Amino acid sequence: MYGLLMALAMLFMAGLCACSAQSSAAETAPQTIVVGIDVFDPYSYLDRNGQFAGIDVGLATEAFSRLGYTPEFRTISWPDKDNLLSDGTINCIWSCFSMNGRETKYQWAGPYMYSRQVVAVRADSDIQSLSDLAGKRIGVQATTKAESLFLGEISSLLPEVKQVNSFETTEDMFAALRKGYVDAVAGHEALVAKLTNLDESSYRVLAESPYSSELGVAFAKDTHEDLAVQLTQTLEDMKQDGTIGRVAEKFGLDAEKTVWGEQGK
């Protein structure tokens, strides 16, 4: 009888230990957070193996890992982003999303870097600064921030140019620059860098940026307040320890200006 009681006691204790181990594992397992992204190379895109890649994908993976989360990336229809946030289909938007003008619309984490518009010219051009663009022919990609800037739809200190030529693709835009149909081209730094890096001896990017905006991670307004604060601090840590700069540089961006802005650190 005593032996039977001992055996039952041991089985009971083993069961308690197993439950405790399972509970502990559940508590330490990373939580999943659903991140909505747009396809915008080099910030967020699918690589040749069909895996999510890019600046924001790398930063989100690292930042959430430091906080004990595993990000689940989900491509979204950009016009539907607010509805997807509000109904909980996604937990946040992390996809080269500008905070400027939207400061009170979302619960933000960040800013974590700057998104810059830049101007590129031919290597032998006499254009050295933005002021030299006065009276020049400018090439831009249609429906982009650069087009709005040079058409005067966004306030800036740009001089009055002679002509704004809008092209369907950045490749067409650079072809026009190469052939001399335009004097300069403007666009997002990442897209311009991708093409100028293919032939560095033929092009030059002006040091001045005509426009920059702060990028952040957007949660639905009045939600995830604690997580947004924690993520903001983690992103600041990643700026300070050089993580964000290294990722930006890997994709051809000016690490100093991308992380710290035009004035630098």
Model-derived segments and spans:
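Periplasmic-binding protein-like
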Residues: I37-V39, Y114-V121, A193, N197-E236, ...
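Short coil/turn segments
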Residues: V39-F40, R48-Q51, F97-M99, R122-D126, ...
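Ligand-binding cleft/hinge of the Venus flytrap
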Residues: L46, A60-Y69, A146-F167, T196-E200, ...
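Acidic, polar ligand-binding/catalytic clefts
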Residues: T61, T70-D132, R204-S209
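A ligand-binding cleft/hinge motif common to bilobed small-molecule-binding domains
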Residues: D80-N83, C96-K105, L149-G152, A176-R178, ...
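Extended ligand-binding regions for polar small-molecule ligands
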Residues: V57-R66, I127, S131-R137, A142-K145, ...
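Extracytoplasmic small-molecule ligand-binding "clamshell" domains
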Residues: A26-C96, S166, Q230, D241, ...
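C-terminal motif of bacterial Sec signal peptides marking the signal peptidase cleavage site
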Residues: G15-A18
